[in-house]
Amino acid sequence: MKSGEKDYSIKEAMIFSQRIAQLSKALWKSVEKDWQQWIKPYDLNINEHHILSIAYHLEGASISEIAKFGVMHVSTAFNFSKKLEERGYLVFSKKEDDKRNTYIEITEKGEELLLKLMEEYNPENNSVFNGALALRNFYGKFPENIELIAILRNIYGQDFIDIFEKSLENIEENFTEQEQKLVKK
């Protein structure tokens, strides 16, 4: 292989990317619904819960760290952290040796809320868990990344899998590569 040459085709890259995109969106829809239902009684949204959890597990963190680990924009992390501070769940601070960054720590009230949520977690209300349970029972462990398709099949049914596989087959059958570009046949 010459320097600068790719050891994959554009079509192969496109199919891989589309598969991951479609699986992720389907999985996220279930995760989001389950997560929202879990935290709704406590008047939290997903970002707020995630921030509380990160602050708890990191035993305090900068807004930048919250954004990074929470997979959110810094302004999102800051704004939702501010709302949590107003409700008494977080406190903001600056460090003597680092005045540039804003840090947050979970308060006792915030920790109590988070621990209550953890206590009240019910896996039977979690469609991703339930979708994976049959695999765990059979293999003795919960699925890893390779098993994502099987989880989605259990959540959304075979028709969903057939539809997304069909879309990938359509790319395979109806597109070709010309001058390192994917074009319709």
Swiss-Prot record:
Primary role: Negative regulator of protease production and sporulation.
One Gene Ontology biological process: negative regulation of DNA-templated transcription
Organism name: Bacillus cytotoxicus (strain DSM 22905 / CIP 110041 / 391-98 / NVH 391-98)
Domain of life: Bacteria
Protein known as: HTH-type transcriptional regulator Hpr
UniProt key word Glycoprotein: no
Entry annotated with the keyword ATP-binding: no
Gene that encodes it: hpr
DNA-binding region: 63-86
Domain HTH marR-type: 13-157
